Amino acid sequence: MITEDYVSFETAKLLKDKGFDEPCLYYYFSDGRIGKRKGLKDRNCSSVNTFSMPTLQMAMKWLRGVHNIVIVIEPHKYDYINEKNSSYVASLWQGDNYYENITSKDYPTYEETADAAIKYCLENLI
């Protein structure tokens, strides 16, 4: 079964700080607990200490559309015994600028790499 993957709590807080305001079904409370709306809504309210919880792809699409940042995630190492990728790295384009291997380490999953790359963009490029 395919499931959705969401940004981490730390990344959600950074997204709010950088102006992310897209409607999301899920959100984080200030203590990291997860809440769910009955309908889509922007949960980055200034009056309530909640943080919208977008999917990784939604956050990456927002970075592309609003900040012209394209994240590229690639396999870095291959486990020939188990016949699968064993780590991933991320690079990105921002306009004509290319940043190679922006994540400080290899991550074991595509999703962890995506979250780290989004966080890097929010902390260093926006």
Task: Label each region the model flagged.
Residues 1-3, 7, 13, 17:
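GGW-centered surface loops in extracellular recognition modules
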Residues 4-9, 23-25, 40, 104, ...:
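Catalytic phosphate/metal-binding cores of nucleic-acid and nucleotide-processing enzymes, i.e., regions
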Residues 13, 17, 21, 30-108, ...:
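N-terminal segment of the canonical double-stranded RNA-binding domain
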